């Protein structure tokens, strides 16, 4: 039987990349899925490709009022939330000496502030036993030059999960982190030259970057009842990159 049958799942940043692959995996496992994105055209295209069982809502996760409206729409259409994936995030490269206030503010607004409000505003709508999954990054453990601000934001996400896990008994949820390594998302493939991608692959013990569906598979496990006793943990889906 599909492992998410009857569950209502929310995925922020679901119009492309890992979020899109996660939405597809959840749909295939029987969940009713709601995804967010900031660009209506990309969101509409994602929903059209994913088909029935997936609903898209334009939402900026750094704006609590937009999240409130989104969660109210989910409740009206599907009821309470069983799985919440706080996946929306951005990464901006800025070498030391060239970091600006704008870089810090934009990265932390989405990756930290957005993650906090994605979870906090969802609290009244979570069903008992809900699984909350935050998207981290190997950058928090093994940062690359120029991505220190991004790495710091993802380290904050890991810390948030530890703190929130302490509230899980009283509030009836569990919270975990999935930290991908380099992943062959459309955005990465468009931005990174082929020779740089090859160098990145050589630094991974498995010798390749991840496919988005491989990250989605880990998230699906954490969303399912098979992980019912997993709480406050970080799952690295990185081919061993940050482990050796």
Question: Which role fits each region the language model picked out?
Answer:
Residues 137:
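Residue(s) in the substrate-gating loop at a strand-loop-helix junction
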Residues 95-96, 100-108, 200:
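Substrate-binding pocket helix/loop in short-chain dehydrogenase/reductase
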Residues 8, 15-17:
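Conserved glycine-rich cofactor-binding loop
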Residues 124, 166-167, 228:
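Alpha-helical segment proximal to the catalytic Tyr-Lys
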Residues 142, 220, 231-244:
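Short C-terminal tail/terminal secondary-structure segment
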Residues 169, 174, 230-232:
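Short, small/polar-rich loop/turn modules that mediate ligand/substrate recognition or access, typified
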